[in-house]
Swiss-Prot record:
UniProt record similarity statement: Belongs to the peptidase M24B family.
Region span, Disordered: 1-22
Function: Catalyzes the removal of a penultimate prolyl residue from the N-termini of peptides.
Protein name per the record: Probable Xaa-Pro aminopeptidase CPC735_009100
Note describing how the cofactor binds: Binds 2 manganese ions per subunit.
CDD domains: Prolidase
Keyword Thylakoid: no
Swiss-Prot/TrEMBL GO biological process terms: proteolysis
Enzyme superclass (EC): hydrolase
Keywords: Aminopeptidase, Hydrolase, Manganese, Metal-binding, Metalloprotease, Protease
EC number in record: 3.4.11.9
Keyword Hydrolase appears in the UniProt entry: yes
Source organism of the structure: Coccidioides posadasii (strain C735)
Alphabetized Pfam families for the sequence: AMP_N (PF05195), Peptidase_M24 (PF00557)
Length: 487
Protein backbone atom coordinates (compact mmCIF):
# COMPACT_ATOMS: atom_id res chain seq x y z
CA UNK A 1 0.00 0.00 0.00
CA UNK A 2 1.36 3.38 -0.99
CA UNK A 3 2.19 5.83 1.79
CA UNK A 4 0.88 9.35 2.15
CA UNK A 5 3.93 10.78 0.40
CA UNK A 6 3.32 8.79 -2.77
CA UNK A 7 3.39 10.88 -5.93
CA UNK A 8 1.03 9.74 -8.63
CA UNK A 9 -0.53 10.79 -11.87
CA UNK A 10 -3.16 9.44 -14.20
CA UNK A 11 -3.13 9.53 -17.98
CA UNK A 12 -6.29 9.08 -20.00
CA UNK A 13 -6.76 8.65 -23.70
CA UNK A 14 -8.41 6.79 -26.52
CA UNK A 15 -6.87 3.96 -28.44
CA UNK A 16 -7.01 4.50 -32.22
CA UNK A 17 -9.10 1.35 -32.38
CA UNK A 18 -11.78 3.00 -30.26
CA UNK A 19 -10.87 1.59 -26.84
CA UNK A 20 -10.71 4.01 -23.92
CA UNK A 21 -7.97 3.42 -21.42
CA UNK A 22 -6.64 4.84 -18.17
CA UNK A 23 -3.12 4.29 -16.86
CA UNK A 24 -2.25 5.11 -13.27
CA UNK A 25 1.45 5.74 -12.64
CA UNK A 26 3.03 5.76 -9.21
CA UNK A 27 6.54 7.05 -8.68
CA UNK A 28 7.07 5.72 -5.19
CA UNK A 29 9.22 2.59 -5.29
CA UNK A 30 10.85 3.38 -8.62
CA UNK A 31 13.60 6.01 -8.70
CA UNK A 32 12.60 8.60 -6.11
CA UNK A 33 13.51 6.63 -2.99
CA UNK A 34 16.23 4.10 -2.25
CA UNK A 35 15.68 0.41 -1.78
CA UNK A 36 15.73 -0.17 2.02
CA UNK A 37 18.81 -2.40 2.10
CA UNK A 38 20.03 -1.39 5.57
CA UNK A 39 16.67 -2.14 7.16
CA UNK A 40 16.63 -5.51 5.42
CA UNK A 41 20.11 -6.25 6.79
CA UNK A 42 19.01 -5.32 10.31
CA UNK A 43 15.93 -7.52 9.97
CA UNK A 44 18.08 -10.48 8.95
CA UNK A 45 20.47 -9.92 11.86
CA UNK A 46 17.49 -9.78 14.21
CA UNK A 47 16.11 -12.98 12.71
CA UNK A 48 19.50 -14.63 13.27
CA UNK A 49 19.34 -13.52 16.90
CA UNK A 50 22.85 -12.05 16.74
CA UNK A 51 24.51 -8.99 18.20
CA UNK A 52 27.84 -9.65 16.49
CA UNK A 53 29.09 -11.34 13.33
CA UNK A 54 29.64 -10.51 9.68
CA UNK A 55 27.21 -11.31 6.88
CA UNK A 56 28.91 -11.80 3.52
CA UNK A 57 27.20 -12.10 0.14
CA UNK A 58 28.42 -12.05 -3.44
CA UNK A 59 26.49 -10.91 -6.48
CA UNK A 60 26.21 -12.90 -9.68
CA UNK A 61 29.44 -12.84 -11.65
CA UNK A 62 29.95 -11.98 -15.29
CA UNK A 63 29.94 -15.19 -17.33
CA UNK A 64 30.00 -16.29 -20.94
CA UNK A 65 27.89 -18.94 -22.59
CA UNK A 66 29.41 -22.40 -22.83
CA UNK A 67 31.94 -22.65 -25.69
CA UNK A 68 31.26 -19.05 -26.65
CA UNK A 69 32.60 -15.56 -26.13
CA UNK A 70 29.06 -14.19 -25.76
CA UNK A 71 27.88 -13.16 -22.29
CA UNK A 72 25.21 -15.04 -20.43
CA UNK A 73 22.15 -12.90 -19.74
CA UNK A 74 22.75 -11.36 -16.34
CA UNK A 75 20.33 -12.16 -13.52
CA UNK A 76 21.18 -10.88 -10.07
CA UNK A 77 21.28 -13.24 -7.13
CA UNK A 78 18.12 -12.43 -5.25
CA UNK A 79 19.55 -12.78 -1.74
CA UNK A 80 22.30 -10.32 -2.66
CA UNK A 81 19.75 -7.87 -4.03
CA UNK A 82 17.65 -8.13 -0.87
CA UNK A 83 20.54 -6.82 1.23
CA UNK A 84 21.84 -4.29 -1.29
CA UNK A 85 19.33 -3.18 -3.91
CA UNK A 86 22.22 -3.47 -6.38
CA UNK A 87 21.52 -5.03 -9.78
CA UNK A 88 25.15 -5.13 -10.97
CA UNK A 89 27.53 -8.07 -11.51
CA UNK A 90 30.82 -8.86 -9.76
CA UNK A 91 30.03 -7.07 -6.50
CA UNK A 92 30.41 -8.15 -2.87
CA UNK A 93 28.66 -7.13 0.32
CA UNK A 94 29.33 -7.24 4.05
CA UNK A 95 27.14 -6.30 6.98
CA UNK A 96 28.89 -5.78 10.30
CA UNK A 97 26.11 -6.65 12.72
CA UNK A 98 27.62 -5.06 15.83
CA UNK A 99 28.61 -1.80 14.12
CA UNK A 100 25.49 -1.73 11.92
CA UNK A 101 27.61 -1.00 8.83
CA UNK A 102 26.57 -2.18 5.35
CA UNK A 103 29.44 -2.07 2.85
CA UNK A 104 29.37 -2.68 -0.90
CA UNK A 105 32.51 -3.69 -2.79
CA UNK A 106 32.50 -2.98 -6.52
CA UNK A 107 34.93 -4.07 -9.27
CA UNK A 108 38.01 -1.95 -9.82
CA UNK A 109 37.84 0.35 -12.82
CA UNK A 110 38.65 -1.57 -16.01
CA UNK A 111 39.51 0.59 -19.02
CA UNK A 112 38.99 -2.21 -21.54
CA UNK A 113 35.57 -3.06 -20.12
CA UNK A 114 34.64 0.62 -20.07
CA UNK A 115 35.47 0.88 -23.78
CA UNK A 116 33.57 -2.24 -24.78
CA UNK A 117 30.49 -2.33 -22.53
CA UNK A 118 30.60 0.89 -20.53
CA UNK A 119 32.03 1.84 -17.14
CA UNK A 120 31.35 -0.30 -14.10
CA UNK A 121 29.74 1.01 -10.95
CA UNK A 122 32.04 3.28 -8.95
CA UNK A 123 31.99 3.70 -5.15
CA UNK A 124 30.88 7.34 -5.29
CA UNK A 125 28.02 6.46 -7.63
CA UNK A 126 27.02 3.53 -5.43
CA UNK A 127 26.75 5.78 -2.38
CA UNK A 128 24.39 8.10 -4.23
CA UNK A 129 22.19 5.34 -5.66
CA UNK A 130 21.97 2.81 -2.85
CA UNK A 131 21.15 2.61 0.86
CA UNK A 132 24.69 1.90 2.13
CA UNK A 133 27.07 2.99 4.86
CA UNK A 134 30.15 2.58 2.69
CA UNK A 135 31.18 1.64 -0.84
CA UNK A 136 34.69 0.50 -1.75
CA UNK A 137 36.53 -1.36 -4.49
CA UNK A 138 36.96 -5.12 -4.34
CA UNK A 139 40.68 -4.98 -3.62
CA UNK A 140 39.85 -3.67 -0.13
CA UNK A 141 37.60 -6.59 0.81
CA UNK A 142 40.24 -8.99 2.11
CA UNK A 143 41.98 -6.34 4.20
CA UNK A 144 38.73 -5.12 5.71
CA UNK A 145 37.61 -8.62 6.68
CA UNK A 146 40.96 -9.28 8.34
CA UNK A 147 40.70 -6.01 10.25
CA UNK A 148 37.18 -6.88 11.38
CA UNK A 149 38.25 -10.39 12.47
CA UNK A 150 41.33 -9.16 14.37
CA UNK A 151 39.07 -7.33 16.83
CA UNK A 152 37.19 -10.48 17.86
CA UNK A 153 38.06 -13.59 19.83
CA UNK A 154 35.90 -15.93 17.72
CA UNK A 155 34.98 -14.20 14.45
CA UNK A 156 32.13 -15.83 12.53
CA UNK A 157 31.16 -14.95 8.96
CA UNK A 158 27.64 -15.90 7.86
CA UNK A 159 27.33 -17.04 4.24
CA UNK A 160 24.54 -18.58 2.17
CA UNK A 161 26.38 -21.62 0.85
CA UNK A 162 29.68 -23.31 1.60
CA UNK A 163 30.90 -22.52 -1.91
CA UNK A 164 30.35 -18.78 -1.46
CA UNK A 165 33.14 -17.88 0.94
CA UNK A 166 35.14 -14.70 0.37
CA UNK A 167 38.48 -15.24 -1.31
CA UNK A 168 40.59 -14.78 1.79
CA UNK A 169 43.20 -17.09 3.31
CA UNK A 170 42.57 -16.84 7.02
CA UNK A 171 42.55 -20.06 9.05
CA UNK A 172 41.26 -18.27 12.15
CA UNK A 173 37.93 -17.41 10.49
CA UNK A 174 34.84 -19.53 11.10
CA UNK A 175 32.12 -19.72 8.46
CA UNK A 176 28.48 -20.50 9.16
CA UNK A 177 26.53 -21.59 6.06
CA UNK A 178 23.50 -23.05 7.84
CA UNK A 179 21.70 -20.15 9.49
CA UNK A 180 21.70 -17.26 7.00
CA UNK A 181 19.48 -18.79 4.31
CA UNK A 182 16.51 -19.65 6.57
CA UNK A 183 16.81 -16.26 8.29
CA UNK A 184 16.67 -14.45 4.96
CA UNK A 185 13.78 -16.62 3.79
CA UNK A 186 11.81 -15.65 6.89
CA UNK A 187 12.47 -11.96 6.25
CA UNK A 188 11.67 -12.14 2.54
CA UNK A 189 8.31 -13.77 3.26
CA UNK A 190 6.88 -10.46 4.54
CA UNK A 191 7.14 -7.54 2.12
CA UNK A 192 7.71 -3.98 3.28
CA UNK A 193 6.03 -0.98 1.71
CA UNK A 194 8.85 -0.38 -0.77
CA UNK A 195 8.75 -3.99 -1.98
CA UNK A 196 4.97 -3.87 -2.33
CA UNK A 197 5.30 -0.76 -4.48
CA UNK A 198 7.76 -2.56 -6.76
CA UNK A 199 5.41 -5.53 -7.13
CA UNK A 200 2.55 -3.11 -7.75
CA UNK A 201 4.53 -1.40 -10.52
CA UNK A 202 5.39 -4.75 -12.11
CA UNK A 203 1.66 -5.52 -12.08
CA UNK A 204 0.80 -2.18 -13.68
CA UNK A 205 3.12 -2.92 -16.60
CA UNK A 206 1.82 -6.48 -16.88
CA UNK A 207 -1.77 -5.22 -16.92
CA UNK A 208 -0.90 -2.81 -19.71
CA UNK A 209 0.66 -5.64 -21.72
CA UNK A 210 -2.32 -7.94 -21.17
CA UNK A 211 -4.62 -5.15 -22.36
CA UNK A 212 -2.55 -4.63 -25.50
CA UNK A 213 -2.84 -8.32 -26.31
CA UNK A 214 -6.62 -8.21 -25.82
CA UNK A 215 -6.88 -5.16 -28.09
CA UNK A 216 -4.98 -6.93 -30.85
CA UNK A 217 -5.92 -10.58 -30.41
CA UNK A 218 -8.62 -10.49 -33.09
CA UNK A 219 -6.02 -9.84 -35.79
CA UNK A 220 -3.32 -12.18 -34.48
CA UNK A 221 -2.67 -15.43 -36.31
CA UNK A 222 -0.05 -17.18 -34.18
CA UNK A 223 0.89 -17.66 -30.53
CA UNK A 224 4.20 -15.98 -31.35
CA UNK A 225 2.37 -12.70 -32.03
CA UNK A 226 0.82 -12.84 -28.56
CA UNK A 227 4.24 -13.46 -27.03
CA UNK A 228 5.76 -10.63 -29.06
CA UNK A 229 3.05 -8.09 -28.25
CA UNK A 230 3.27 -8.77 -24.53
CA UNK A 231 7.06 -8.54 -24.49
CA UNK A 232 7.12 -5.42 -26.67
CA UNK A 233 4.73 -3.59 -24.36
CA UNK A 234 6.74 -4.47 -21.26
CA UNK A 235 10.08 -3.46 -22.77
CA UNK A 236 8.68 -0.18 -24.07
CA UNK A 237 7.66 0.67 -20.48
CA UNK A 238 11.11 -0.06 -19.08
CA UNK A 239 10.60 -3.66 -17.97
CA UNK A 240 13.20 -5.51 -20.03
CA UNK A 241 12.96 -8.75 -18.07
CA UNK A 242 10.08 -11.14 -17.60
CA UNK A 243 9.47 -12.81 -14.26
CA UNK A 244 9.30 -16.17 -16.05
CA UNK A 245 8.95 -17.57 -19.54
CA UNK A 246 5.83 -16.25 -21.26
CA UNK A 247 3.09 -18.86 -21.65
CA UNK A 248 0.93 -18.09 -24.68
CA UNK A 249 -1.06 -21.28 -25.08
CA UNK A 250 -3.96 -21.64 -27.49
CA UNK A 251 -6.51 -24.42 -27.74
CA UNK A 252 -5.37 -27.72 -26.25
CA UNK A 253 -1.96 -26.21 -25.50
CA UNK A 254 -3.68 -24.40 -22.62
CA UNK A 255 -3.93 -27.77 -20.88
CA UNK A 256 -0.11 -27.86 -20.68
CA UNK A 257 0.67 -26.03 -17.45
CA UNK A 258 4.07 -24.65 -18.46
CA UNK A 259 3.73 -24.51 -22.23
CA UNK A 260 6.37 -22.13 -23.63
CA UNK A 261 6.81 -23.05 -27.30
CA UNK A 262 4.42 -20.23 -28.23
CA UNK A 263 4.72 -20.94 -31.95
CA UNK A 264 1.50 -22.56 -33.16
CA UNK A 265 -1.21 -21.03 -35.38
CA UNK A 266 -4.35 -19.87 -33.61
CA UNK A 267 -6.65 -21.02 -36.43
CA UNK A 268 -10.11 -21.73 -35.00
CA UNK A 269 -8.97 -22.57 -31.48
CA UNK A 270 -11.44 -21.54 -28.82
CA UNK A 271 -9.31 -19.94 -26.09
CA UNK A 272 -5.89 -18.52 -25.33
CA UNK A 273 -4.30 -18.86 -21.90
CA UNK A 274 -1.74 -16.08 -21.44
CA UNK A 275 0.35 -16.50 -18.30
CA UNK A 276 2.87 -13.65 -18.33
CA UNK A 277 4.25 -11.12 -15.88
CA UNK A 278 6.79 -8.33 -16.11
CA UNK A 279 9.64 -7.88 -13.66
CA UNK A 280 10.37 -4.47 -12.18
CA UNK A 281 13.65 -3.79 -10.37
CA UNK A 282 14.07 -7.53 -9.75
CA UNK A 283 10.53 -7.92 -8.34
CA UNK A 284 8.06 -10.23 -10.05
CA UNK A 285 4.46 -10.13 -11.11
CA UNK A 286 2.53 -13.27 -12.04
CA UNK A 287 -0.66 -12.76 -14.04
CA UNK A 288 -2.80 -15.18 -16.04
CA UNK A 289 -5.80 -14.42 -18.21
CA UNK A 290 -7.74 -16.84 -20.43
CA UNK A 291 -9.76 -15.34 -23.24
CA UNK A 292 -11.36 -15.96 -26.66
CA UNK A 293 -10.30 -14.23 -29.86
CA UNK A 294 -13.64 -12.46 -30.16
CA UNK A 295 -15.62 -10.47 -27.57
CA UNK A 296 -17.80 -13.48 -26.77
CA UNK A 297 -17.35 -17.09 -25.72
CA UNK A 298 -17.11 -19.33 -28.79
CA UNK A 299 -18.92 -22.27 -27.15
CA UNK A 300 -21.08 -23.16 -24.18
CA UNK A 301 -18.25 -25.36 -22.95
CA UNK A 302 -15.71 -22.51 -22.87
CA UNK A 303 -18.18 -20.20 -21.11
CA UNK A 304 -19.00 -22.92 -18.58
CA UNK A 305 -15.40 -23.61 -17.63
CA UNK A 306 -14.51 -19.93 -17.39
CA UNK A 307 -17.44 -19.46 -14.98
CA UNK A 308 -16.22 -22.36 -12.86
CA UNK A 309 -12.70 -20.97 -12.54
CA UNK A 310 -14.01 -17.45 -11.98
CA UNK A 311 -16.07 -18.64 -9.01
CA UNK A 312 -13.11 -20.61 -7.65
CA UNK A 313 -10.90 -17.54 -7.76
CA UNK A 314 -13.42 -15.03 -6.44
CA UNK A 315 -14.37 -17.10 -3.40
CA UNK A 316 -10.76 -17.92 -2.56
CA UNK A 317 -9.64 -14.30 -2.89
CA UNK A 318 -12.51 -13.15 -0.69
CA UNK A 319 -11.30 -15.59 1.97
CA UNK A 320 -7.82 -14.06 2.19
CA UNK A 321 -6.75 -12.28 5.37
CA UNK A 322 -4.20 -12.60 8.13
CA UNK A 323 -4.60 -15.78 10.16
CA UNK A 324 -6.28 -17.81 7.42
CA UNK A 325 -4.68 -21.15 6.59
CA UNK A 326 -3.89 -21.03 2.88
CA UNK A 327 -4.35 -24.78 2.70
CA UNK A 328 -8.02 -24.31 3.58
CA UNK A 329 -8.47 -22.05 0.55
CA UNK A 330 -6.77 -24.63 -1.65
CA UNK A 331 -9.25 -27.25 -0.46
CA UNK A 332 -12.11 -24.77 -0.92
CA UNK A 333 -11.08 -24.32 -4.55
CA UNK A 334 -11.32 -28.09 -5.07
CA UNK A 335 -14.73 -28.27 -3.41
CA UNK A 336 -16.05 -25.53 -5.70
CA UNK A 337 -14.54 -27.24 -8.73
CA UNK A 338 -16.20 -30.52 -7.79
CA UNK A 339 -19.60 -28.88 -7.21
CA UNK A 340 -19.47 -27.10 -10.56
CA UNK A 341 -18.13 -30.07 -12.54
CA UNK A 342 -20.87 -32.23 -11.05
CA UNK A 343 -23.47 -29.73 -12.25
CA UNK A 344 -21.95 -29.86 -15.76
CA UNK A 345 -21.96 -33.66 -15.81
CA UNK A 346 -18.17 -33.89 -16.09
CA UNK A 347 -18.03 -35.51 -12.66
CA UNK A 348 -20.67 -38.01 -11.58
CA UNK A 349 -21.68 -40.77 -9.21
CA UNK A 350 -20.60 -39.39 -5.87
CA UNK A 351 -20.92 -36.63 -3.32
CA UNK A 352 -18.54 -33.70 -3.17
CA UNK A 353 -16.77 -35.32 -0.21
CA UNK A 354 -16.45 -38.72 -1.90
CA UNK A 355 -14.97 -37.19 -5.02
CA UNK A 356 -12.66 -34.97 -2.95
CA UNK A 357 -11.31 -38.01 -1.11
CA UNK A 358 -10.85 -39.94 -4.36
CA UNK A 359 -8.58 -37.30 -5.89
CA UNK A 360 -10.65 -37.15 -9.08
CA UNK A 361 -10.62 -33.35 -9.08
CA UNK A 362 -6.82 -33.48 -9.41
CA UNK A 363 -7.31 -34.72 -12.97
CA UNK A 364 -8.74 -31.29 -13.80
CA UNK A 365 -6.99 -29.09 -11.21
CA UNK A 366 -3.54 -30.66 -10.72
CA UNK A 367 -1.58 -27.80 -9.16
CA UNK A 368 -1.60 -25.68 -6.04
CA UNK A 369 -3.81 -22.66 -5.59
CA UNK A 370 -0.88 -20.27 -5.37
CA UNK A 371 2.51 -19.24 -4.07
CA UNK A 372 4.45 -16.30 -2.69
CA UNK A 373 5.54 -13.54 -5.10
CA UNK A 374 8.53 -11.27 -4.57
CA UNK A 375 12.12 -11.33 -5.77
CA UNK A 376 11.28 -14.71 -7.27
CA UNK A 377 8.03 -15.42 -9.06
CA UNK A 378 7.76 -18.47 -6.80
CA UNK A 379 9.22 -16.63 -3.86
CA UNK A 380 10.84 -18.13 -0.79
CA UNK A 381 9.38 -18.69 2.65
CA UNK A 382 10.56 -20.56 5.75
CA UNK A 383 7.81 -23.17 5.27
CA UNK A 384 7.74 -24.03 1.55
CA UNK A 385 4.77 -26.43 1.70
CA UNK A 386 1.59 -26.45 3.73
CA UNK A 387 1.27 -28.59 6.84
CA UNK A 388 0.82 -32.15 5.62
CA UNK A 389 0.45 -33.56 9.14
CA UNK A 390 -2.86 -31.86 9.85
CA UNK A 391 -5.35 -34.46 11.03
CA UNK A 392 -8.09 -32.47 9.29
CA UNK A 393 -6.69 -33.35 5.86
CA UNK A 394 -4.62 -36.44 6.63
CA UNK A 395 -4.39 -38.72 3.60
CA UNK A 396 -6.12 -36.31 1.25
CA UNK A 397 -4.53 -36.77 -2.21
CA UNK A 398 -4.90 -33.06 -3.00
CA UNK A 399 -1.92 -32.30 -0.74
CA UNK A 400 0.46 -34.03 -3.13
CA UNK A 401 -0.08 -31.61 -5.99
CA UNK A 402 2.98 -29.83 -7.32
CA UNK A 403 3.65 -27.47 -10.32
CA UNK A 404 3.09 -24.90 -11.56
CA UNK A 405 3.31 -23.58 -8.04
CA UNK A 406 4.19 -24.69 -4.56
CA UNK A 407 1.69 -24.16 -1.81
CA UNK A 408 2.12 -21.20 0.50
CA UNK A 409 2.69 -21.03 4.24
CA UNK A 410 0.30 -22.68 6.71
CA UNK A 411 -1.07 -19.37 8.00
CA UNK A 412 -1.22 -16.11 6.10
CA UNK A 413 0.38 -12.99 7.58
CA UNK A 414 -0.11 -9.34 6.75
CA UNK A 415 2.52 -8.25 4.24
CA UNK A 416 2.61 -11.49 2.29
CA UNK A 417 2.00 -11.29 -1.44
CA UNK A 418 0.50 -14.50 -2.81
CA UNK A 419 -1.08 -15.58 -6.05
CA UNK A 420 -4.54 -17.05 -6.33
CA UNK A 421 -4.53 -19.05 -9.56
CA UNK A 422 -7.13 -21.81 -9.83
CA UNK A 423 -7.53 -23.60 -13.11
CA UNK A 424 -9.51 -26.32 -14.85
CA UNK A 425 -7.73 -28.28 -17.59
CA UNK A 426 -8.61 -31.03 -20.03
CA UNK A 427 -5.25 -32.71 -20.47
CA UNK A 428 -5.28 -35.76 -22.72
CA UNK A 429 -2.37 -37.43 -20.86
CA UNK A 430 -4.02 -36.80 -17.48
CA UNK A 431 -7.36 -38.16 -18.70
CA UNK A 432 -5.70 -41.21 -20.25
CA UNK A 433 -3.97 -41.91 -16.96
CA UNK A 434 -7.24 -41.43 -15.05
CA UNK A 435 -8.97 -44.14 -17.09
CA UNK A 436 -6.72 -46.74 -15.45
CA UNK A 437 -7.53 -45.68 -11.90
CA UNK A 438 -10.49 -46.35 -9.58
CA UNK A 439 -11.29 -42.62 -9.57
CA UNK A 440 -12.37 -42.95 -13.22
CA UNK A 441 -15.82 -44.03 -12.01
CA UNK A 442 -16.41 -40.41 -11.01
CA UNK A 443 -15.55 -38.99 -14.46
CA UNK A 444 -17.94 -39.07 -17.41
CA UNK A 445 -15.47 -39.46 -20.25
CA UNK A 446 -18.17 -38.97 -22.89
CA UNK A 447 -19.04 -35.54 -21.51
CA UNK A 448 -15.34 -34.73 -21.11
CA UNK A 449 -14.79 -35.20 -24.85
CA UNK A 450 -16.94 -32.14 -25.56
CA UNK A 451 -14.62 -30.05 -23.37
CA UNK A 452 -11.28 -31.18 -24.83
CA UNK A 453 -11.17 -28.27 -27.35
CA UNK A 454 -11.42 -25.79 -24.45
CA UNK A 455 -7.92 -26.87 -23.43
CA UNK A 456 -7.71 -25.14 -20.08
CA UNK A 457 -8.70 -22.03 -18.17
CA UNK A 458 -6.56 -20.38 -15.52
CA UNK A 459 -7.11 -16.97 -13.87
CA UNK A 460 -4.36 -15.56 -11.67
CA UNK A 461 -3.94 -12.41 -9.60
CA UNK A 462 -1.27 -11.21 -7.15
CA UNK A 463 -2.82 -10.46 -3.76
CA UNK A 464 -1.42 -8.51 -0.83
CA UNK A 465 -2.60 -9.96 2.47
CA UNK A 466 -3.64 -7.36 5.05
CA UNK A 467 -4.71 -7.65 8.69
CA UNK A 468 -8.40 -7.48 7.86
CA UNK A 469 -8.48 -8.67 4.26
CA UNK A 470 -6.53 -8.15 1.07
CA UNK A 471 -5.57 -5.81 -1.75
CA UNK A 472 -5.59 -7.11 -5.31
CA UNK A 473 -2.44 -5.75 -6.96
CA UNK A 474 -3.40 -7.08 -10.40
CA UNK A 475 -5.47 -4.74 -12.56
CA UNK A 476 -5.61 -6.65 -15.85
CA UNK A 477 -9.27 -7.00 -16.86
CA UNK A 478 -11.03 -10.34 -16.51
CA UNK A 479 -14.56 -11.62 -16.96
CA UNK A 480 -16.96 -9.19 -18.62
CA UNK A 481 -14.43 -6.34 -18.62
CA UNK A 482 -11.98 -8.59 -20.42
CA UNK A 483 -14.50 -9.43 -23.15
CA UNK A 484 -15.38 -5.75 -23.54
CA UNK A 485 -11.70 -4.96 -24.10
CA UNK A 486 -11.46 -7.29 -27.10
CA UNK A 487 -12.20 -5.38 -30.30
Amino acid sequence: MAGSNTLSSSEHGDDPRGHSYSIHIQTRGTTLDKYPAKQHARNVARQLGLTDGLIYLMSQSTRTLEDSDQPQPFRQRRYFFYLSGVDEPDCHLTFDIKSDILTLYVPHYDLRKAIWVGPTLRPSEAMMRYDLNAAKTYDELSKNIRTWASKRMSPVIYILHEGQKPNINAHFLAFNHEDLLPAMDACREIKDEHEIDLIRRANEISASAHIEVLLGIRNMQNEAEIHGKFLDTCVSQGARNQSYEIIAASGENAAILHYTKNNEPLDDRQLVCLDAGAEWNCYASDVTRTFPRRPYWPSCESANIYSVVQRMQEECINGLKEGVRYLDLHILAHRIAIEELLSLGILKGGSTEEILQSGASLVFFPHGLGHHVGLEVHDVSPTPLMAFSLDKYKGLPLLSCRPPCTLSAPYLKAGMVVTVEPGIYFSRPALKDARRKPLSKYIDMDVVQKYIPVGGVRIEDDILVTRDGFENLTKAPKGREMLKTIR
